[in-house]
Amino acid sequence: MIRIDGSYGEGGGQILRTAIALSALLGVPVEVFNIRAKRANPGLQPQHLTGVNAAALLTDAELEGAAKGSTRLVFKPKTIKCGGFQIDIGTAGSISLVIQTLTPIALFAPCPVRLSITGGTDVAWAPPIDYMRFVFAPVVGRFGGRVKIEVLRRGHYPKGGGRVEVEVAPVDVLKPVDAVDFGKVLKIRGISHAVNLPAHVAERQARAAAEALAKEGYAADISTEVRNDGLGPGSGVVLWAESDVGNVVGGDALGERGKPAEAVGREAAEKLLTALKSGASVDSHMADMAVVYMALAEGVSRITTPELTLHLQTNMYIVERFLPVKFRVEKLGQRHLIEVNGVGRRR
């Protein structure tokens, strides 16, 4: 059994998500202790438990300590199952973080995995669902993984109620990705959404984002999505840039009470511009998710990221605990190069 100190590095839910995903897909039991020990509300919270229980559902895992507030969890997986699964987070807990946990497992299932997930689509401290659709899924696609994400209804804090359907096709082996330079920007697109709010909120967010990008010489095609089917109000913007060599980077921002729509649009644009100006092949959020796929792929993968975040360093550490790999990190001007010789995991 692999033992992981949950207070290492970033010391949050990321350690748990990565450890559980790798435990499940490799069939190796794991014990995570000191879970979120340094946080104001230590231990497992409902959104963490959802990911753990969902991974257990996919692998018939035995669990110890899977309770709210628990600082120790033992996860003993069996075989990966496939087919359809219903997952209800029960709060506005992030659907995206559940997708992040389950995708690597589902890629190595014996047949396609279909997930119907209820919870929060656009919530703080997690990637928005449109980021998962238009940045995460294409990047996983470069490794040879097919992930299809469909949003049936959006859900915001505090009520949630969002509904998302995900389909993951199995792979025999993941391909390595060699992406050092972002390349030339082909197009920038985006979605500005508003739920149970006036249409002008989505329009103002989109306009402000487009103006901020235009000042830097970039034209953007940002669509607006106005819906009135949510359990509560909410808004946000996700932008993404695609390059001539197949790279995708993103930037996003969430609306909140008292925050002008224009500020939301500008914030998303600034995040995207940070990634573009660095010339990195992935943005800093995608980098910490990508290292799992790099380590599982067959052969040498290389990516560059605008910054070496604590999340990224923590994830590399966890991956190295589960797999016989060693990440190499090198500073390249404004970027950091991450390189690893993957194990070529097969189903």
From Swiss-Prot:
Top-level division of the source organism's lineage: Archaea
Principal location class: cytoplasm
InterPro entries: RNA3'-term_phos_cycl_insert, RNA3'_phos_cyclase_dom, RNA3'_phos_cyclase_dom_sf, RNA3'_term_phos_cyc, RNA3'_term_phos_cyc_type_1, RNA3'_term_phos_cycl-like_CS, RNA3'P_cycl/enolpyr_Trfase_a/b, RPTC_insert
Catalytic activity, as annotated: a 3'-end 3'-phospho-ribonucleotide-RNA + ATP = a 3'-end 2',3'-cyclophospho-ribonucleotide-RNA + AMP + diphosphate
Any one annotated GO CC term: cytoplasm
Active site: H311 (tele-amp-histidine intermediate)
PROSITE patterns for this protein: RTC (PS01287)
Residues where ATP binds: Q100, H285, M286, A287, D288
Compartments it resides in: Cytoplasm
Annotated S-S bridges: none
Record-level GO BP terms: RNA processing
Keywords, comma-separated and alphabetical: ATP-binding, Cytoplasm, Ligase, Nucleotide-binding
Pfam families per UniProt: RTC, RTC_insert
E.C. no: 6.5.1.4
Any GO MF annotation of the entry: RNA-3'-phosphate cyclase activity
NCBIfam families, sorted: PRK04204.1-2, RNA_3prim_cycl
UniProt function note: Catalyzes the conversion of 3'-phosphate to a 2',3'-cyclic phosphodiester at the end of RNA. The mechanism of action of the enzyme occurs in 3 steps: (A) adenylation of the enzyme by ATP; (B) transfer of adenylate to an RNA-N3'P to produce RNA-N3'PP5'A; (C) and attack of the adjacent 2'-hydroxyl on the 3'-phosphorus in the diester linkage to produce the cyclic end product. The biological role of this enzyme is unknown but it is likely to function in some aspects of cellular RNA processing.
Family: Belongs to the RNA 3'-terminal cyclase family. Type 1 subfamily.
Full protein name: RNA 3'-terminal phosphate cyclase
